[in-house]
Amino acid sequence: MSVFDSKFNGIHVYSEIGELETVLVHEPGREIDYITPARLDELLFSAILESHDARKEHQSFVKIMKDRGINVVELTDLVAETYDLASKAAKEEFIETFLEETVPVLTEANKKAVRAFLLSKPTHEMVEFMMSGITKYELGVESENELIVDPMPNLYFTRDPFASVGNGVTIHFMRYIVRRRETLFARFVFRNHPKLVKTPWYYDPAMKMPIEGGDVFIYNNETLVVGVSERTDLDTITLLAKNIKANKEVEFKRIVAINVPKWTNLMHLDTWLTMLDKNKFLYSPIANDVFKFWDYDLVNGGAEPQPQLNGLPLDKLLASIINKEPVLIPIGGAGATEMEIARETNFDGTNYLAIKPGLVIGYDRNEKTNAALKAAGITVLPFHGNQLSLGMGNARCMSMPLSRKDVKW
């Protein structure tokens, strides 16, 4: 039985808010058990997660979506299914690419040992080890380091390695080395899974300019919005604009780049501003003095559209995209104190996942913001995420929509 239901016909995402049909997630595996105090900064975590609780929290998040009929695809299952369906040559390339990209770099002897170890496992277990890391005890080799292959503990943030853009994808070059290997799985499934192999790529990690999915938004079928952030550069967005412009089948007419604070704990646009309904947006007031906007004209901007500074304030900019007056909801609500705004911004208070217009999922810990959303007519489906939030992401970070219904604007 395929990970995809019978309704899935390939990538189709033309909004942030259309009814969610198919979504990619990853329940944290053994990889989070290998986070140690000495490596917190390197692995991009604020604290060590309690693994059992983190998994229970993630299961609660997934249950909310499954209970509403959403086809929830687990990354491990998708990669394993793709591997079983792939040609012998594709399987070999997948394993060899993994070995070449492994951190730390493998000696020839360890490369041989890891290859044999992986190929001795059933497919699903093999993929789990590729994601979680491999110790010297599991491999049966002598080493000063316990880990022969490092873990990928950020994999539960499926938003970032690639993004669904219309009927295509952007597969990313991640800013930090610890996350770059994550795109191996996206590259493999989009080259080899029968349901995904024909998907056009608008960005390839071989382009080696940083961009991550938490910065990529599809506001409607004409406009992309991309963050200029701690993880994504304006020059990368310029290259993306050129790539999209060059594809004659793409409908998008405009890209808007939004500058946000370059904070390591709030690293993407979706930790500062998100779209939750046809005209309702949630934002952090902390970013007010940093917001700056550039326009890319994909219709009249020539073969290589360049960023044009747009001097509009946030509300007028959003109005120019959605063609109506936006409702701007600040984190914590209109009466929130600076401390309340700072606390709820820190725990990704803007990072909700819309599963229908005005129906969103997010952490229960951001109580002030949840109340403000309710007052603005947004329905919040809350879940407990005190452990998951230590990885610095909320529901949007932990999901990559693969298909949404089109919105009737």
UniProtKB/Swiss-Prot annotation:
Compartmental location: Cytoplasm
E.C. designation(s): 3.5.3.6
Active site per UniProt: 397 (amidino-cysteine intermediate)
Single GO biological process annotation from the record: arginine deiminase pathway
Annotated catalysed reactions: L-arginine + H2O = L-citrulline + NH4(+)
GO cellular component entries: cytoplasm
Classification via InterPro entries: Arg_deiminase
Keyword terms of this UniProt record: Arginine metabolism, Cytoplasm, Hydrolase
GO molecular-function terms, A-Z: arginine deiminase activity
Membrane spanning stretches: none
Pfam families in alphabetical order: ADI
Gene3D superfamilies: Arginine deiminase, L-arginine/glycine Amidinotransferase, Chain A
The protein's annotated pathway: Amino-acid degradation; L-arginine degradation via ADI pathway; carbamoyl phosphate from L-arginine: step 1/2
Protein family according to the UniProt entry: Belongs to the arginine deiminase family.
HAMAP family tied to this protein: Arg_deiminase
Name of the molecule in the record: Arginine deiminase
Organism, scientific name: Metamycoplasma hominis (Mycoplasma hominis)
Gene designation per UniProt: arcA
